[in-house]
């Protein structure tokens, strides 16, 4: 009897040990994610609280809580009225840059990625390898040749000087090829061709609908990347009326260093306002980009 119960007790101890190990791993992973969440959210929380303060309260009050004077409305009014409402012009410019680049580059990425995934032709892998290689090239290495090309084309200090260099997104092409290979079944396309549908009709009627989550994911990457782009406008633009928000807020910050009338609360509030469209876009489109990233991670 004693001999028969020993294996059972050992089995129970082993199960408890495995359960304790899983619990420890889950707890550590949860704590790790909480720590990273706090790390990433802390600057945003500070930004929200700081945008509600006066310039005096900004340095005299606790950073992660409200000050006695709630000045968010006054700060926002100051942001939009300073320098003849130049911030509003920067906001419109940024929407124009980010919207145009995101829509066009994502559409091109969808077409190219779909073609690389669903068609067999000579040089396909070479083209895809070149696209992957271009992802590895740092943007700073292309600044001088890009500036010279834009200068020759008389596109420096124009809207097109910011938009054109960003219309092709190699990373977006990569994502759309990976997504197309899994989201669009070959049998479905073959059935459409048997029914008499041409390649364009098969793409628009079938593939484009199935690629919507991937399209939204790449769109968000392009939109956020262009919205936050600072270096390219810095090189291409010199007219403040053409600045995006990133370059405009940086120019205001420079005025503080030069002893101007600019205050930190204006820049902080402007940065908070600049974040709102990004947050809204992610919240409205989260249903699509979550599924797009999920399938991309499974196929990658």
Where are these regions (language model features)?
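DHp/HisKA histidine-phosphotransfer helix
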Residues: 23
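Short, Lys/Arg-rich, polar N-terminal cytosolic tail immediately upstream
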Residues: 1-20
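A structural signal for multi-pass alpha-helical bundles of membrane permease subunits
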Residues: 26-300
